[in-house]
Regions:
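C-terminal lobe and pocket-closing loops
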Residues: 269-282, 294-358
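Extracytoplasmic/periplasmic solute-binding protein
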Residues: 133-141, 146, 171-218, 224, ...
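Short helix-initiation/N-cap motifs at beta->coil->alpha
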Residues: 68-77, 167-171, 244-257
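Conserved N-terminal structural module of periplasmic/extracytoplasmic solute-binding proteins
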Residues: 2, 6-103, 112-121, 134, ...
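Paired acidic/hydrophobic, glycine-rich loop segments that form the ligand-binding mouth/hinge
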Residues: 89-92, 262-267
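Short amphipathic alpha-helical coupling segments at ligand-binding clamshell hinges
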Residues: 48, 52, 227-231, 313-325
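Hinge/lid segment of periplasmic solute-binding proteins
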Residues: 94-147, 171, 198, 282-288
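Glycine-centered hinge/linker elements that transmit conformational signals in sensory
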Residues: 174-176, 180, 214-245, 290
Length: 358
């Protein structure tokens, strides 16, 4: 079974005073709020609400409210916050959202720089997601890595003893498994993570791309894209449950744990929940790399970050909270509480003990 490590591959203008961290002050706000999409790992949310928020209130007198948003709804919530200039001042962003909401988010280059100096440096691969026009618009706390999740026992029943290395080999295995009553289930609906978590890598593995390296020249209409789409059509028709067309990110988790499917792409959440609630399923669950296509093997980054909304009434207080939250004393505990579901983009965590817990 894959180990967790395998599975995942500057101060405020106040200077020295800011470096001392959060402190009580007569002008400090009495409260602030953070909006987050609900995590697939409930303990991650619970740790913030039950441990981190009370600790910060005890330290500073500032109560930090935590607003959970249902899975798949964060982008809509963020759009409303930015357009109405109202709501929580600290917001959850995903993937490339800082680029979409550039004008609605404050510059947090100083915070990111300080965090990078203390527990970094930052991995270079995060910069394209959160740095907009040379300014950090969000501070990442981790990546939600994805692999292929599959039932080793059912694969063995059809003679497949290791996870297929190419898309065509996975298609062949899927045909056999579907005939045995163990179809695949890859999300093809209007989700937000699992659909593009496998479809972008599939597109890239055939040489397709949306735009050129300049980020402007549109290249999606190509022979390579057509080949990827044709494979996707066959993959769906010959291996999957029909209702994947209406799935969102929660459906494949539920289907796998209900033993309705033998393979899907997912983060660690399926295995984490299986180990807790379905130990017999966990024993026969493993992970494989995304298959190769004619142009190689690819995976998609899914960075999760905090940003400060432009309407924040006290940007200095919001930054002070993020500095405290991203201090190793807090951040490492939070990540561990979440079963290392999120892999930070900070070199200081590359060899953290949490990666050795299976």
């Amino acid at each position: 079974m894959s180990t967790r490590r395998e599975f995942l591959t500057t101060a405020l203008a106040g200077g020295a005073a800011a470096a001392l961290g959060p402190r009580r002050a007569s002008a400090a706000p009495k409260s602030m709020s953070v909006v987050h999409e609900s995590s697939f790992i409930k303990a991650f949310d619970d740790y913030f609400v039950k441990t981190l928020s009370p600790e910060y209130e005890k330290l500073t007198g500032i109560k930090v409210a935590y607003e959970p948003v249902s899975v798949g709804s964060m982008l809509t919530r963020l759009t409303t916050i930015v357009e109405t200039k109202a709501g929580p001042e600290i917001v959850h962003t995903g993937i490339n959202w800082p680029h979409l909401f550039d004008q609605g988010l404050l510059d947090v280059t100083d915070v990111a720089g300080e965090v990078g100096k203390k527990i970094g440096p930052w991995h270079d691969n995060i910069l394209d997601s959160v740095v907009v026009n040379k300014k950090w618009k969000a501070v990442p706390w981790g990546n939600i890595g994805q692999l292929e999740v599959y039932r080793t026992d059912w694969f063995k029943e059809v003679g497949v003893t290791k996870f297929p290395d190419t898309w065509e080999d996975l298609l062949a295995a899927g045909r056999l498994l579907k005939k045995k009553g163990h179809p695949f289930g890859f999300e093809l609906g209007h989700g937000f993570g699992d659909n593009h978590g496998w479809m972008y890598p599939l597109l890239w593995s055939y040489g397709g791309r949306e735009v050129d390296k300049d980020g402007k020249t549109v290249l999606i209409d190509s022979d390579e894209t057509a080949k990827a789409v044709d494979f996707c059509r066959r993959f769906y028709k010959e291996t999957m449950l029909e209702d994947v067309l209406g799935w969102t990110d929660v459906n494949n988790n539920k289907a796998y744990l209900a033993e309705q499917i033998s393979c899907t792409n997912n983060a660690m959440s399926i295995l984490i929940v299986a180990k807790r609630d379905f130990p017999d399923i966990a024993k026969v669950t493993d992970h494989g790399l995304n298959p190769q296509g004619p142009k190689g093997r690819f995976h998609l980054y899914n960075p999760q970050s905090h940003a400060i909304a432009a309407h924040a009434p006290d940007p200095a207080a919001a930054k002070a909270f993020l500095r405290w939250l991203y201090d190793d004393k807090q951040l490492s505990r939070w990540l561990v509480a979440g079963d290392a579901y999120y892999a930070p983009f900070l070199n200081g965590y590359d060899n953290h003990p949490m990666w050795n817990v299976d």
